[in-house]
């Protein structure tokens, strides 16, 4: 079926038409086949007189006077005399091919009542005979003659076919128009006979109209007369549509009339219920609906919040700022639109990824107060379906999520990773703004931190609050919340999210130092001392945090941990000296005890082996006294604790020189002598290696001519880890008795014995 649906190829049509015309031209046409006697066989009115022909067995019942023939002329009825005259024409005899035709032609069997068309297929012998005769008799001249006849007759055939088609269509149109006109005339005659008075009145009105507006009246008459033609064209174009429309209209009317009693009954019941409610409410005081009451309460709370703010949010353009903008669309599904109950634009929100794969929406609090719907690429949801996860009133920041299943798919969000405030750097970020239905991107430059937020140079307008700032990886770094007050800063301000464990940052503690963060790289860094700065309260789901933010410091602790750290002293959780605080986890390698190239070079130098028993006993370590909590202290203890804190703070501010290391006490002579004796015994009992030359001469071995080699005594290598002189003789000088600093093989001391040099 697919082949019938393909468009028709014009080349195939022309090729088929050419083959058909050639086929009809090469073979004799209807009514021109002659038997050997010269009588037309197609006429069906003469008897076969000898010869072999395919028409010998054809039945020829036909009337002698009239016979119907399939001719190309204007008339289909001819007499036997016309047929005989046609057969005697010299144009009908073109050779043996036509006189002895083996092809089967239509035979019209004429009867007074009907005509039947009988077709007889030729046999293989007849086809073979005609083909051999064609090859034998046809020459080049005959082929050229037939081709020229074809070229001359083709335009006539085409014009004749077109004329016949036009005549048929004209006859059809004439019949339709005549029938329609006769029907209109019959209607007019019937109306004139039935109501002659009204008919005369209508005719007078028609004449008046025709005299006043001749063109319009004539065009209307023409349209009425040609209505059948218009109707035929309309039915040909929209016949199926008209039928379906009629069926639908019929079905609707049927269903309407069938359901009319039930619809009427329901309307009456509704009217009765409404009237009864009105009558019962007439004696009662008027009540307000819960929806309107909630709306009024929401509006009043929003007004109170706006009036209670110390620094109201302003939306204005920065004068003199001209930033080049490029046409570009933001990441799809990240920026959401916030609207009020009337569908008016309020601001924007951003979809971000939180810790543990949770999805949240970040937006300013002043945008949240006026927002009723959150619109995404796929749909919208009410703000009442969301709950707060993170809220900082000082920064006007809010993170929300919803307990509704599949709310992200309903909105069509595609969240991006969220970067906390401790990783924001002073550089340019991408800010997308919408203007006239199109999105543009600009370079928003973060120039300085201020009050826990950022000063950003960007070109914004009222209604851009909530737009996110993206970095190069399209991570959400900060959120635009408006402009600073004109008396403070002329730039815009943006807030970032503080690192809350298990919400916006990892729960594992991160220790940072000058090697990881610096003031030149980030706007804020994790603080070692959080005693100064502004205190901010962060509310999350189920717990609260206190944050101290200074000019370049951010510290985040829960309330319980904050009290514990304050009771211990001025040293905080991120202090460098972790040995004084056993509760804090150890450093991962970035600290005072981190391995450096200098320490590694010192560790590579070999040190002489000593016995640990000869080392002096370590000094007893002072026991740590547990710090008493401040809530458990007496007033005298609190005063002493305050004094200790002040002294520690002053000592920390003043530069102090590191304490000098005390030299270890030199061992006694008896200890050195005992140590030397043990070393000599150990050296004498050691067997020489097989791979090195031995001092003995091999008698029955494999190398009898080998001589002993004299070893040269090496100078001892001085130790770089201590100032104690090395052990080099038995003169009773001091030696290093400390513990081993590496696990490399130690050079054993051999007093009074020569040693050969080692090979590298």
Swiss-Prot record:
Q: Pfam families under this entry?
A: Peptidase_S39
Cite the Peptidase S39 domain residue spans from the record. Answer: 318-515
Q: What is this protein called?
A: Protein P1
Q: Which InterPro entries match?
A: Luteovirus_Orf2, Peptidase_S39B_luteovirus
User: Which segments cross the bilayer?
Assistant: 172-192, 194-214, 218-235, 240-260
Q: What does this protein do?
A: Precursor from which the VPg molecule is probably released at the onset of the RNA synthesis. Essential for virus replication.
UniProt-annotated catalytic positions: 366 (for protease activity), 396 (for protease activity), 465 (for protease activity)
Alphabetical UniProt keywords: Hydrolase, Membrane, Protease, RNA-binding, Serine protease, Signal, Transmembrane, Transmembrane helix
Regarding the membrane, this protein is recorded as: Multi-pass membrane protein
Presence of keyword Cell division: no
What GO biological process, any one, is recorded here? proteolysis
Task: Give the UniProt subcellular location, in the record's own words.
Answer: Membrane
Lineage here is: Viruses, Riboviria, Orthornavirae, Pisuviricota, Pisoniviricetes
């Amino acid at each position: 079926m697919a082949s019938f649906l393909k468009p028709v190829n014009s080349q195939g049509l022309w090729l088929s038409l050419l083959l058909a015309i050639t086929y009809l031209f090469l073979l004799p046409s209807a009514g021109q086949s002659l038997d050997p006697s010269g009588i037309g066989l197609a006429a069906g009115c003469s008897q076969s007189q000898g010869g072999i022909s395919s028409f010998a067995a054809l039945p020829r019942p036909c009337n002698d006077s009239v016979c119907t023939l399939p001719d190309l002329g204007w008339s289909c009825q001819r007499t036997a005399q016309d047929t005989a005259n046609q057969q005697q024409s010299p144009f009908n005899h073109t050779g043996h091919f036509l006189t002895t035709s083996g092809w089967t032609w239509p035979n019209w069997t004429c009867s007074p009542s009907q005509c039947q068309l009988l077709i007889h297929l030729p046999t293989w012998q007849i086809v073979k005979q005609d083909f051999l005769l064609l090859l034998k008799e046809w020459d080049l001249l005959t082929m050229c003659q037939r081709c020229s006849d074809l070229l001359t007759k083709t335009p006539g055939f085409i014009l004749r076919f077109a004329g016949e088609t036009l005549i048929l269509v004209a006859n059809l149109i004439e019949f339709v128009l005549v029938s329609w006109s006769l029907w209109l005339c019959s209607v007019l005659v019937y109306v004139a006979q039935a109501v002659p008075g009204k008919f005369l009145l209508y005719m007078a009105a028609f004449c008046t109209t025709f005299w006043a507006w001749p063109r319009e009246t004539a065009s209307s008459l023409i349209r009425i007369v040609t209505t059948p033609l218009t109707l035929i064209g309309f039915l040909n174009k929209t016949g199926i549509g008209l039928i379906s429309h009629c069926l639908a209209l019929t079905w609707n009317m049927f269903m309407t009339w069938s359901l009319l009693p039930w619809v009427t009954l329901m309307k009456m019941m509704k009217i009765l219920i409404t009237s009864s409610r009105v009558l019962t409410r007439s004696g009662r005081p008027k009540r307000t609906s819960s929806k309107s009451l909630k709306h009024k309460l929401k509006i009043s709370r929003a007004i109170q919040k706006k009036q209670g703010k110390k620094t109201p949010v302003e939306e204005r353009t920065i004068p003199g700022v001209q930033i080049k903008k490029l046409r570009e669309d933001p990441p799809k599904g990240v920026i959401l639109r916030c609207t009020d109950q009337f569908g008016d634009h309020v601001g924007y929100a951003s979809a971000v990824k939180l810790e543990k794969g949770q999805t949240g929406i970040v937006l300013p609090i002043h945008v949240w107060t006026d927002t009723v719907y959150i619109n995404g690429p796929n749909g919208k949801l009410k703000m009442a379906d969301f709950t707060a996860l993170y809220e900082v009133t000082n920064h006007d920041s809010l993170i929300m999520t919803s307990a509704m299943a599949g709310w992200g798919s309903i909105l069509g969000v595609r969240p991006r990773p969220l970067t906390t405030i401790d990783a924001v750097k002073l550089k340019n970020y991408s800010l997308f703004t919408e203007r006239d239905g199109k999105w543009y991107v600009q370079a928003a430059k973060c120039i300085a931190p201020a009050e826990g937020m950022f000063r950003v140079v960007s070109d914004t307008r009222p209604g851009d609050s909530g737009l996110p700032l993206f970095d190069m990886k399209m991570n959400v770094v900060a959120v635009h919340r408006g402009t600073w007050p004109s008396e403070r800063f002329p730039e815009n301000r943006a807030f970032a999210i503080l690192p809350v464990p298990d919400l916006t940052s990892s729960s594992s503690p991160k220790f940072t130092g000058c090697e990881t963060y610096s003031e030149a790289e980030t706007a804020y860094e994790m603080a070692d001392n959080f005693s100064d700065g502004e205190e901010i309260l962060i509310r999350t789901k189920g717990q609260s945090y206190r944050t101290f933010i200074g000019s370049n410091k951010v510290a985040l602790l829960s309330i319980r941990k904050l009290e514990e750290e304050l009771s211990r002293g001025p040293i905080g959780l991120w202090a460098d000296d972790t040995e004084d605080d056993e509760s804090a986890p150890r450093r991962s390698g970035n600290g005072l005890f981190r391995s450096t190239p200098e320490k590694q070079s010192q560790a590579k130098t070999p040190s002489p082996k000593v016995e640990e028993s000869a080392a002096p006993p370590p000094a007893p370590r002072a026991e740590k006294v547990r710090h008493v909590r401040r809530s458990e202290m007496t007033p005298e203890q609190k005063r002493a604790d305050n004094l200790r804190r002040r002294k520690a703070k002053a000592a920390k501010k003043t530069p102090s020189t590191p304490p000098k290391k005390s030299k270890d006490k030199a061992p006694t002579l008896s200890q050195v002598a005992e140590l030397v004796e043990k070393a000599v015994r150990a050296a004498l009992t050691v067997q020489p290696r097989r791979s090195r030359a031995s001092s003995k001469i091999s008698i029955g071995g494999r190398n009898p001519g080998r001589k002993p080699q004299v070893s040269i005594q090496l100078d001892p290598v001085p130790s770089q880890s201590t100032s104690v002189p090395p052990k080099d003789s038995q003169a009773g000088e001091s030696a290093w008795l400390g513990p081993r600093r590496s696990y490399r093989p130690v050079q054993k001391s051999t007093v009074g014995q020569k040693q050969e040099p080692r090979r590298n």
